[in-house]
Amino acid sequence: MKSPRLMLFLCALAGTAALAGSTVVPASDSWPDFRGPTQDGHVGDANLPDSWSETENVKWKTETPLLGLSSPIVLDNQVWLTTATVEGHEFYALCFDATTGELTTQVKLFHSDDPQSMGNGAKDNSYATPSAVIEPGRVYVHYGHFGTACLDTETKEVIWKRDDLKCWHYRGASSSPVLFEDLLILTFDGADLQYVIGLDKKTGETVWKTDRSAEWNDEHIDKVPIQEGDWRKAHSTPLIVEIDGKSVMCSTGAKAAYGYDPRTGEELWQVEHEAYSATPRPLYHDGSFIIVTGFSKGAEMMSVKAGGRGVVNDTHINWRFDTSFPKYSSPILVDGLLYYAMDDSFAVCVDAKTGETVWKGRLGGKYRACPIVAGGKIYFFSLEGNTTVIEPGREFKVLATNALATDAPLDDPRRGPGFMASPAVVGDAMFLRTRYHLYRIEAK
């Protein structure tokens, strides 16, 4: 029997997920998913500061061991991260005290004698990039091919582990796990195998597994891909929403985006596309999913009506365009307008109903982390360690720009980008992970 606290948590999470894209969001007392309780970056009425620096509005700053790019997850005064050795031999879960910043737990979970190489993807990835998910009493951590584990948040003991779910990640794993009812749902979009899988969150046992069904059109007669590598890869995390009383999971893979029944893994519909390495998480707004398909000349951003059966390209696409869309960072939706940061230093605002560009403004920098909206303001976090705060609306208006130090010794393998992990917000505090530190930002 579920505890009353767990029931309240799950009901709140399910209710806010169904409101994806709405600006009416309750104040956040936890951050259970890398895009928050609503899975779309909405914080609610948090009173975050507009400005901060290494000496202003930083409650604490703690060094994070080893290397990981996963986003912070917060519940019950615990901040959870994952990390790994730079070469990918050892994999850990980390727990910090949210009040003091103290590292209270470092649990070694997996070991690899011969880790998969990430090739030139190592500059944008790590061996601990998928973010954890948490609920009262349990935290779930995932390292792709290397393993998945469930830990007791009180004792820090391992409840279950799996290390038999395989694929060749080619440039490393990035897709984060998703909790849904009694399931933990994982995404494996490798260069060789592509599938989504639902595990019993209590035991780790497989409940369902569904292979991607895209028409690859890149095979020899013996089903071996003509070109191995990126062409079948994706990095996106699914979004689950409730539509007309039924749960639908939207998941973007290479060559197609899919709608699934998250309870059974049944494929409901498919939108074919011509791209690979999709990274942004889908959004849901007014009966449609907003999808970014990834890289290649055929990559695009599109709005797809939820529903239908089979391939729905001819019947369910509202709009699509193939320029000025985000390749890495997920968009955010406020009052019918989409906002996102591109990798060329610009932010873009698009009408979610029509796909028409409202404005384009220069932020500066490059972007991997996902934006948030809090207290009526949108926050963008750059690779260079800067945060730009803008006012939502039909005109581009910058309210503040803030910087945190990202310098590191030249021989430090972790030196480089500031924000690749997305932020977490609980109450009026924001938790930011750079390559080598975790910060708590809060007005003093």
Region locations from a protein language model:
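Noncatalytic, solvent-exposed loop/strand surfaces
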Residues: 21-444
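Positively charged n-region of N-terminal signal peptides that target proteins for export
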Residues: 1-6
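Bacterial N-terminal signal peptides
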Residues: 7-18
